Amino acid sequence: MSDIALTVSILALVAVVGLFIGNVKFRGIGLGIGGVLFGGIIVGHFVSQAGMTLSSDMLHVIQEFGLILFVYTIGIQVGPGFFASLRVSGLRLNLFAVLIVIIGGLVTAILHKLFDIPLPVVLGIFSGAVTNTPALGAGQQILRDLGTPMEMVDQMGMSYAMAYPFGICGILFTMWMLRVIFRVNVETEAQQHESSRTNGGALIKTINIRVENLNLHDLAIKDVPILNGDKIICSRLKREETLKVPSPDTIIQLGDLLHLVGQPADLHNAQLVIGQEVDTSLSTKGTDLRVERVVVTNENVLGKRIRDLHFKERYDVVISRLNRAGVELVASGDISLQFGDILNLVGRPSAIDAVANVLGNAQQKLQQVQMLPVFIGIGLGVLLGSIPVFVPRFPAALKLGLAGGPLIMALILGRIGSIGKLYWFMPPSANLALRELGIVLFLSVVGLKSGGDFVNTLVNGEGLSWIGYGALITAVPLITVGILARILAKMNYLTMCGMLAGSMTDPPALAFANNLHPTSGAAALSYATVYPLVMFLRIITPQLLAVLFWSIG
């Protein structure tokens, strides 16, 4: 059998063994995709014992391409919500998550200096302790750029594997410990979170208001300042028994009922200006109007602003809200449409059908993947990651590398959405498949390279010490920030658990947090809020640590 055929066969075996290990769960908790790393270590140990020779060049290419696939698909997935997560609504959560990353870096630096841990080893421990595989790839690349011998670079994968198991268990232990320390009642926390979502926050809500302000009588909607901006949409107007779709030129009268869509704070301001909220239903049921959700799939409208499509003037249809990548937005006229946007339309059936034809609304297109944008994005990402940035007194130029470059490019392209007829939307199933394929390839190679010396290092070497160092890097930041978030910020416990899981980019921890109260979405919401920024920082941090440690000796 040729070296290439043998290498492919061994990688397939690693994937099978690793995925089987990852699916084994104890009390609902398992290694997940991380099991592939240990599958690689097991197979790698026996490959080494048998004296088999694998194609090192092929392994290197597969490892790097797997990493690129993984980080690129992550960027495309979170890109639409990445920049939104940095705004005020998620600022506090992101600040605490960033603090966890910073403290983790400080603990790593202290351990490196106190115990004189070799640079590749300490970077591997750091990456494993925070269960972040792209950090491992980024660290290995910067070490190669710094001229580190390959046998030392491979040690990073071994120390990563030593620290990884407690990285998963440590965050679960932290959640449990914080629950005990603060005597948390999970049911109460879930109710408080739901109450806060109802009474405030950046959620999109709807209310029905009666026009009671005499100054508004016989004014056009466009002449009412609170209704003339982009913060509130008036999607229905009821006068006596007639329900209609209003336009900016529609004249309002005292006693009219308006159905408004917007954020709670803006709707409250509308009540102060227009009148009180009423319980009267403005449902389209039994009328000649209907509400329908339509998906944007027509390439001809991508990038166009809602106001430039003139749906109200041409079809007497109002867009009441927009859902983009799971985030509800007010359908501001200045919003540019992206592939996969879901619009709430209000109007007559025939008019809605006409607008749906303009927008596309072809559900089957949502399952198709445009491969051209995928490879354009990957190519641009690799180019971006290869651009050197020279810093005085640093021993090597800084680069985003094969982990950071594709990630940042994917975040940007995911945020842009489309350029002409090229769109970077990827169906969730396709995104997940490519992401899982990438991480399986990467971890398989890392495990294979580490397997030959893993057992000897664990039994006769410093493996146990590495596990201890990893436990400190995992636990100290999580416990410190968890206590600060609860005491100083009075953070909801379920929200805090999601934030802690997101700060470690750890899906098993999110699953554990979700199971604390299965019907509450608090943990998942905070996890998604901090995940994009933290993933970026986790990839950059080992590179900064490597250059810093190298430069100071």
Curated annotation (Swiss-Prot):
Keyword Transport in annotation? yes
Specify the signal sequence span: none
Q: Cross-referenced Pfam families, in alphabetical order?
A: Asp-Al_Ex, TrkA_C
Q: Keywords for this entry? A: Cell membrane, Membrane, Repeat, Transmembrane, Transmembrane helix, Transport
Where is it found, in Gene Ontology cellular component terms? plasma membrane
GO terms for biological process?
A: potassium ion transport
Q: Where in the cell is it found?
A: Cell membrane
Transmembrane residue ranges: 4-24, 28-48, 65-85, 95-115, 158-178, 371-391, 394-414, 439-459, 464-484, 533-553
Q: Which SUPFAM superfamilies match?
A: TrkA C-terminal domain-like
Chief place of localization = membrane
List residues of the RCK C-terminal domain: 191-276, 279-361
| GO MF annotations in UniProt | monoatomic cation transmembrane transporter activity
Membrane topology qualifier: Multi-pass membrane protein
The text of the family note is: Belongs to the AAE transporter (TC 2.A.81) family. YidE subfamily.
HAMAP family referenced in this protein's UniProt entry, alphabetically: YidE
Protein name per the record: Putative transport protein YidE
Q: Which species is the source of this protein?
A: Shigella dysenteriae serotype 1 (strain Sd197)
